[in-house]
Amino acid sequence: MIENLVREEIKGFKNYEVHSIPYRYKMDANETPFELPEEVIKNIQEIVKSSQVNVYPDPTAEKLKEELARYCGVVPTNIFVGNGSDEIIHLIMLAFINKGDVVAYPHPSFAMYSVYSKIAGAVEIPVRLREDYNYDVDSFIKVIEKYQPKLVFLCNPNNPTGSVIEREDIIKIIQKSNGIVVVDEAYFEFYGNTIVDVINEFENLIVLRTLSKAFGLAGLRVGYAVANENILKYLNLVKSPYNINSLSQVIALKVLRTGVLKERVNFILKERERLIKELSKIPGIKVYPSKTNFILVKFKDADYVYQGLLERGILVRDFSKVEGLEGALRITVSSCEANDYLINGLKELLL
């Protein structure tokens, strides 16, 4: 009986899967190897007390918005805070997408664009990246001209390929589009280039950011959107009243104010280049350039490598069964110890 009540879009639907696998080093989800900054840990009791968990959190996350606005060089009314950027993607769909509307996104890219498009009943147009995983801007523009998508996603840098789309090409796509263009800058801190400065020039632009990656707060689920006030008012109409819990708001605020970001990002960038250099010495594999905190690597036998790493306690992300990513594993840049262990593990398996 229940099956007859389920929406057609949900029947046969496969959600995003997160596997629980024992590991020694977790290098599969692009998380930071760093714990909370020491000054935050020292004051954790005071932080918990100040968050007043016995009352509902600030529904507008006003103090956090003010700090994020300072960080982005905008005003607080240009900021929308979500329970991870995943929630914001979902809210964009709720606010703007009717069943049958067209959503375009790069492929391969972040899986949640497709997941939430399916839930919304949208018509999906995946736009293939080039063979080298760079954006095919001409193909994107042709899709926009032909299908007039109501929503276009650009992941920059792109996950899981680590490739980027240039600023002038993003602007070209925004100008061509009559719909909303979402530029997902989840890995901005590792790249340095942004489109945030033109949010008030283009009414149809939303920039997504997160505190899960460079700031190391994946467990708190804090993402945010930067856009003009007119577009954000519709996200506020469809969001839950208390979507960011009190602890997340207070800890995120403290971490934003610590000033540890630059040092930690520099460490990841240095380790990323070291990993790329060392892995490139191993014959039979292809290491792709990256502007993120992960690298994409192709192997002749990805299953063998994945299982071999797993047996050594190293968990990486297997994309080898995804169309366009055949033979590929994605590896998070982690601590020196974890990176060394990975390099040695791959040498044992392949040399």
UniProtKB/Swiss-Prot annotation:
Its EC number is 2.6.1.9. It comes from the Bacteria. One of its GO terms (biological process) is L-histidine biosynthetic process. InterPro entries: Aminotrans_II_pyridoxalP_BS, Aminotransferase_I/II_large, HisP_aminotrans, PyrdxlP-dep_Trfase, PyrdxlP-dep_Trfase_major, PyrdxlP-dep_Trfase_small. The keyword Transferase applies. Homodimer. Belongs to the class-II pyridoxal-phosphate-dependent aminotransferase family. Histidinol-phosphate aminotransferase subfamily. This is Histidinol-phosphate aminotransferase. It comes from Thermoanaerobacter pseudethanolicus (strain ATCC 33223 / 39E). The gene is hisC.
